[in-house]
């Protein structure tokens, strides 16, 4: 279990990056509060759930102040019988006019028994704001895999490169090369040949 609450003051800019490679059940709660005008927060997450594990991720970005910005990017992979649930909450409070709150989540499922769920929620108490969410959950498109294979890749390589394209924005924020290598090794392990 991991719980992180942050507050952004003034013109502060806070980025929270979480990569969950835990081989077990997990519950992660991330909350970012922008409490003064002009603050900005970005939350980026990546999670892999396999075997029969259940991963729950709750991300809550709260605009308390006017002209503040909150961004959320979540990426997940489910394989075997793993379950992945992402609750993304964008919350623009009364008085936070001129604010932005955006979220984007993509979940890829590799196996029939794996499940991924994304539950975006926007709570808006103010006018004159920009708020949106985008969500994609499902298997990798077979036509995309076919196209990449027609260019010389194996199905496993195609899945790996597609997965990496989603993980890359999260990995770019990690300065520890050993952690980046762990993510790549884990992806190699969970992506099976067809």
Describe each region flagged by the PLM:
Residues 1-146, 150-153, 169, 174, ...:
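Conserved beta-strand/loop scaffold segments within soluble protein domains that form the structured core
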């Amino acid at each position: 279990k991991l719980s992180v609450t942050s507050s952004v003051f003034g013109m502060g800019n806070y980025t929270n990056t979480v990569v969950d490679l835990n081989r077990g059940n997990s519950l992660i709660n991330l909350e970012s509060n922008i409490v003064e005008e002009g603050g900005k927060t970005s939350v980026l997450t990546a999670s892999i759930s396999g075997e029969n594990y259940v991963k729950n991720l709750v991300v809550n970005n709260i605009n308390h102040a006017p002209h503040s910005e909150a961004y959320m990017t979540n990426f997940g992979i489910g394989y075997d019988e793993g379950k992945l649930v992402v609750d993304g909450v964008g919350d623009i409070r009364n008085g936070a006019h001129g604010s932005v709150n955006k979220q984007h989540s993509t979940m890829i499922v590799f196996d029939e028994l794996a499940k991924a769920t994304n539950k975006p929620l926007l709570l808006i108490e103010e006018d004159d704001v920009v708020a949106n969410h985008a969500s994609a959950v499902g298997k990798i498109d077979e036509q995309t895999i076919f196209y990449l294979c027609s260019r010389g890749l194996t199905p496993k390589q195609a899945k790996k490169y597609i997965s990496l394209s989603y993980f890359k924005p999260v990995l770019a924020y990690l300065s520890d090369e050993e952690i980046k290598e762990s993510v790549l090794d884990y992806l190699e392990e969970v992506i099976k040949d067809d």
